[in-house]
Structures are given as C-alpha cells and as structure tokens.
Curated annotation (Swiss-Prot):
Catalytic activity of the protein: 4-CDP-2-C-methyl-D-erythritol + ATP = 4-CDP-2-C-methyl-D-erythritol 2-phosphate + ADP + H(+)
Cystine connections: none
GO molecular function, one term: 4-(cytidine 5'-diphospho)-2-C-methyl-D-erythritol kinase activity
Gene Ontology terms describing biological process: isopentenyl diphosphate biosynthetic process, methylerythritol 4-phosphate pathway; terpenoid biosynthetic process
Keywords (A to Z) from UniProt: ATP-binding, Isoprene biosynthesis, Kinase, Nucleotide-binding, Transferase
Xref: Gene3D superfamilies: 3.30.230.10, GHMP kinase, C-terminal domain
EC number: 2.7.1.148
Pathway(s) served: Isoprenoid biosynthesis; isopentenyl diphosphate biosynthesis via DXP pathway; isopentenyl diphosphate from 1-deoxy-D-xylulose 5-phosphate: step 3/6
Residues that coordinate or bind ATP: P100, I101, A102, A103, G104, I105, G106, G107, G108, S109, A110
Group of enzyme by EC: transferase
PANTHER family, sorted: 4-DIPHOSPHOCYTIDYL-2-C-METHYL-D-ERYTHRITOL KINASE, CHLOROPLASTIC
Protein's name according to its UniProt entry: 4-diphosphocytidyl-2-C-methyl-D-erythritol kinase
Job description of the protein: Catalyzes the phosphorylation of the position 2 hydroxy group of 4-diphosphocytidyl-2C-methyl-D-erythritol.
C-alpha cells in the first residue's frame, strides 16, 4: 500500500524593526545591532512536500524579483541544516512570494526560517535545537529572529534574542517599489572595522519598556525615544525613503513613522485599524505602483 505523504505549510511573516541601533562594526566586519522587532500579518507562503529531492518552485507576484532558485535562502537554509543533521529528510518546497524583495522586512529571511520550521516538523526536530539555530545563523543575520517570529529585542549580529511582549499595533507598511541593498546602506553608514557608531556606546541603555497591557501612548513614547540608525544612509541610497516617511507621518492618526531594517519599507503606527485602513487607501490612490499594506504588528 502506497504511503500518502502530506504536504506541510508555514507562513513566512514580514519582520518589522520598530527601532534599530547600530552599536558599531566589529573587527570581523559584522555590525552589532540592537533592535525591537515585531512581525506583521502579511507573509509569504511556503509548502514542503516531504520525501522528494531538495528543490524549490516559486510563484506569486514577486517571483520575478527572487533571482535564481539556487540562490534562494530557502535552499541555503535547507542545505545548511542537512550538513548539521545527518540523514535529514528534505523535499520539494513551493514558495508563494507576496512580500517585496530587498525591502527591509526580512522577506527572504522569513522564507528561510519557514523552511527550517518545516524541516523541523517533518524530521521531529525541536525549534530550539542548537543545530537548527546554528543553521539559521549561518543562513543570515535576520533568520534566527524569524524562526520564532515573536516580538523581541534582537542584539549582537542577530543571534541574541530577548522576548519583549508588545500589544497588537495597528499599522500601515509602505514600500515604494525600489530596492535598497543592505550592503549599500551599511556602506553609506561608513563604519570601519572596529569602529563604534557616533553617539553610541558598547552598552545601549534600553528604556523601561511598558507592560503589554499599558496604554498605547506609553508604548509610542518608549518607541519614539528610539531611532533607526540606518534611515539617514538609506535616504542617501534612495531619497524616496524620506518621502515615504514624511507621507506616513502626515497621515491622520499616525502616532509614529519610521523605516524598517535597511529600507525601503517604512511603517506608521496608528491608534486604530480604521485610521490605518483609511491612510493606506489614501496612499495607494496617490501612489498606485507602491506596495501598501494596512494590518497589525505583534
């Protein structure tokens, strides 16, 4: 009797950096960061059909931006985990690419993390297995935080994760459909190996974060005390980033507007879903070619 193999599916939720401090650049060239990270309700979809040879089939509105399948982080993550777990059963991945590429919301990293979760499920591996987290770190700096896809403070080069319960936030995310390569933004930041960022010490004094159930105003005040150190260099690479932030900040009901990651996606937090939806509709009407999403961050 032929065994029926059931396909497994995961959502690869977009990552949003509510704050992002660049502490400095290590002597090995990696940048030390501290960032409050949350996840949006928009996502790519990833499915694994266990038992097949390792492969990737990509579709969706952003598929042409992905490049060759062999370079996709899904395949990279699977191969790295296979190196660490002898006898790992892989399979055929199907990616539904919905999120913008090179957008500062960890689309590729979220896809890779979803692949690791799928392989963990199909092989009986715990998500906190050191081998899985090692594969995540080797795949990319944003992959470890995307494995759990839970709000946290991310430190180091992405491997230090401290849970930070946040309330559900109404938000609008906007990408002007321009790519902002991370390497170009860090190059514009201009730190040399071993150099600290101006005005930042080795230890960043984090604010006393409110309780999850605290009034929204307390959270906005705490988040407003932070910054994204990559905003200024991203504006040098793509000036439209500044236009997007200004547009979001000017929307009725916007409480905080900022860039996520290394850009070009920016976000604004609103006091209600209705205000966020109205703002998103207005922005989409004015800029029909932009990617605009009204939803929640958590």
């Amino acid at each position: 009797m032929t065994e029926v193999v059931t396909a497994l599916s995961e959502q690869a939720r977009a990552k949003v950096n509510l704050t992002l401090r660049v502490i400095g650049r290590r002597v090995d060239g990696y940048h030390e960061l501290e960032s409050v990270v949350v996840f949006a309700d928009c996502a790519d979809g990833l499915t694994l059909a266990p038992g097949q040879d390792l492969s990737l089939d990509a579709s969706g509105p952003r598929v042409t931006e992905c490049g060759d399948n062999a370079d996709n982080l899904v395949i990279k993550a699977a191969r790295l985990l296979a190196e660490l777990v002898p006898g790992l059963k892989t399979g055929g991945f199907s990616l539904d690419k919905q999120l913008p590429i090179a957008a500062g919301i960890g689309g590729g990293s979220a896809d890779a993390a979803a692949a690791l979760r799928l392989l963990a499920r199909s092989n009986g591996i715990a998500l906190d297995d050191p081998r899985l987290m090692e594969a995540a770190k080797r795949t990319g700096a944003d992959v470890p935080v995307c494995v759990a896809s839970a709000s946290c403070i991310m430190g180091g080069i992405g491997e230090k994760l401290t849970p930070l319960p946040l309330p559900r936030l109404s938000a609008v995310m906007v990408n002007p459909r321009v790519g902002v390569p991370t390497k170009d933004v860090f190059a514009a930041l201009g730190l040399k190996n071993g150099q600290l960022n101006v005005g930042v010490t080795d230890v960043v004094a984090a604010p006393a974060w409110p309780d999850r159930d605290a009034p929204l105003g307390e959270w906005i005040a705490a988040l407003s005390a932070g910054v994204n150190d990559l905003e200024a260099p991203a504006k040098q690479v793509q000036p439209v980033v500044g236009e997007v932030i200004a547009l979001l900040a000017a929307c009725d009901g916007a409480l905080l507007a900022r860039m996520s990651g290394s850009g070009a996606t920016c976000f604004a937090i609103f006091g209600s879903d209705a205000e966020a939806k109205a703002a998103a509709q207005a922005i989409q009407r004015a800029h029909p070619n932009w990617w605009v999403h009204a939803g929640t961050l958590s």
